[in-house]
Amino acid sequence: MKAFIRKLSIKERKGYVNSIIYTIFSFLHIIITKSILYHSKISFITILFISGSLLIMMSFYRIFRLMSKFKSIQKENIKMNFMVGLSSFLSYFFLMASIDSTSLTNIVFISRLYPFLVMFYHTLTKPENISNHQLISFIIYVFSFSIIFFPALYRDTGFGVVYCLLSILFKFTSLQYLSNAKGLNVDLLMLNIGFFNAFFGGIIVITTFDEVDHIGKFIWLLIMLNALCTYFMKIFLNKVLKGDDNEQKLMFLSVIALLFIMPFDFYVFEQNFYYNYLVLIFSFAEFFFFYKKVKKVIKTNTNYQ
């Protein structure tokens, strides 16, 4: 272990430390939020306001710090970084606001914010690498992630069905644009986790939840179809962008992690709180492969352009 650390440059060590710290921060936030919701009378809106305010303050702090530190960064990249940071906060805010705090299933879905927070973190810390391709992939991710929440809210009006279909259409229309990228877009790695979450989650909901009516199950089928579209898009991009083994390792890791985590989410959460540690272990592994990917792309100086 010491030999491995000695081989790393100061910049690489800082990257690993930041990844570990942010992983701990993300899951402490999730665990504390869940604990407060279950064991206190503090309103959900109060927690939402505090956590949302902290996130937006962090984003503005990072943006202005980077603007003052890296004078060589183009204004267009700073502007795009600001857009991504702001849109990620707004998406986070509205998603959290749409969750019913009395529903166990919906509270569990808060833990799915982890990949979203990873992307949020990396777009704020590497603004010089932001490109149109990353912005488009970020929008696709927001569609993929938010689709888990909104159908349950609008299934009586049919809006959930329309939302799913629009998301599927959006993915197909984005294929041609994304295929023009010359470098590897690491943000698309997070789509793997979103796919397996939605797909296996849909299977569990359809087969085990008796309270979900036929309309709800139909919408979950659309969610699963949407996840499959995302996955096939990822396979297509792998061939075009020539992804390396680390990406396949991350995808495999996501499968194993979610196969273990899903049963805990839906059946054991109320009685057993220790599954969060299992999530944390897999998170460290995900961060390792994710950071190695970022380091390789930066080393080859592709900058996703």
Where are the predicted features?
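Cytoplasmic-side transmembrane-helix entry/capping segments in multi-pass membrane proteins
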Residues: Y16-S19, K75-M83, I130-Y141, G160-V161, ...
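Glycine-/small-residue-enriched transmembrane alpha-helix faces in small-molecule transporters
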Residues: M1-T46, L86, F94, L153-N180, ...
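Specific alpha-helical transmembrane segments that line the substrate/conduction pathway
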Residues: T46-F49, S53, M96-P127, S167, ...
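Specific transmembrane alpha-helical segments of multi-pass solute transporters/efflux pumps
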Residues: S26-L28, L66-T105, L228-D244
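Hydrophobic alpha-helical transmembrane segments of multi-pass integral membrane proteins
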Residues: R13-I21, F44-I63, I140, G183-C229, ...
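Helix-helix packing/entry segments at the starts of transmembrane helices
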Residues: I107-L113, L178-F196, Y231-F266
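Hydrophobic transmembrane alpha-helices of multi-pass small-molecule transport proteins
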Residues: A3, N132-F150, F260, Y275-K295
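Hydrophobic/aromatic residues within transmembrane alpha-helices
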Residues: I36, I47, S98-I99, L124-K126, ...
